[in-house]
A protein has these predicted regions:
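Catalytic center-proximal scaffold of phosphoryl-transfer enzymes
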Residues: 1-258
Length: 258
């Protein structure tokens, strides 16, 4: 017991070496982009009218004055119709995550084994990320020749029909898939943040047991929801100025009667 007690005591004449000070780690720049200000638009209007709304908001945000401008979207034709009509000077970028979902399905169609399909998918995904989508399309054309063209009455689950649709998607968006150039220019390559905002809107308008028999009511809810998700305080400003607000100063009665 005495031995154990003396072992716990500091030894006389023995100096402990000072611990080496660790060099402070250099602060690395954040990899993910930081959101500065988000404004959200939502409407049941036709894409022609909605495109004009987007343009007005972009002008208000002074996006047209930016030295680098990008218009990111999925393969929906109406998105690129809006780009052509209102944002022609913006670099068109197909959302990379949408592109790879088509590549994944194409790899499943072109390979019989899961491991082989994954290997093909990884190679095509890498080539597309490097801006070499033309090579991927060439390989898919070769696979299409092997499978054959679909008949006119082909079912939706026919592999030949699915491959035809995938090739059409890639061909139509080939000019919006120069991801190597976009990365060098510092442009975004995905609309994931916008997809997240859409889900936040859907939580309010597409929830359980929600039915919109009145389109005007749905439009009003969409406007309020979009304003609530915006960072510029547009919803509090609207509520403070709306008719009937308790904080709003009412005009004199003689003016009300007039």
């Amino acid at each position: 017991e005495n031995a154990r007690e003396t072992d716990d005591l500091p030894r006389q004449g023995v100096k402990k070496k000072p611990k080496a000070k660790r060099k402070p780690k250099k602060a690395r720049p954040p990899h993910k982009p930081q959101r500065i200000l988000r404004t959200v638009l939502s409407s049941m209007k036709h894409s022609h009218e909605f495109g004009a709304q987007i343009k007005r908001e972009a002008r208000r945000r002074r996006f047209f004055e930016a030295p680098r401008k990008a218009f990111v979207g999925d393969g929906l034709p109406s998105n690129w119709a809006i780009h052509t009509e209102h944002f022609r000077d913006f670099t068109p970028v197909l959302d990379f995550t949408h592109a790879v979902t088509y590549l994944f399905r194409a790899a499943q169609l072109c390979a019989s084994e899961k491991e082989e399909a994954w290997s093909i998918y990884a190679r095509w995904m890498t080539s597309t990320w490097r801006g070499q989508v033309s090579e991927v399309i060439g390989e898919l054309r070769a696979h299409q020749q092997r499978l054959g063209l679909p008949p006119d009455d082909a079912a939706d689950d026919d592999p030949r029909e699915q491959l035809r649709l995938i090739l059409g998607y890639l061909e139509n968006n080939r000019g919006r898939m120069h991801y190597d150039q976009y990365r060098r220019a510092g442009l975004p390559t995905t609309s994931a943040w916008m997809e997240s905002a859409v889900k936040e809107i859907n939580y309010r308008v597409k929830g359980t047991e929600m039915f919109w028999n009145n389109p005007d009511g749905a439009e009003s809810i969409l406007q309020i929801r979009a304003a609530a998700l915006s960072d510029d305080g547009r919803l509090p400003r609207f509520l403070a100025r709306r008719p009937g607000c308790s904080l709003l100063r009412r005009p004199p009665r003689h003016l009300q009667a007039a």
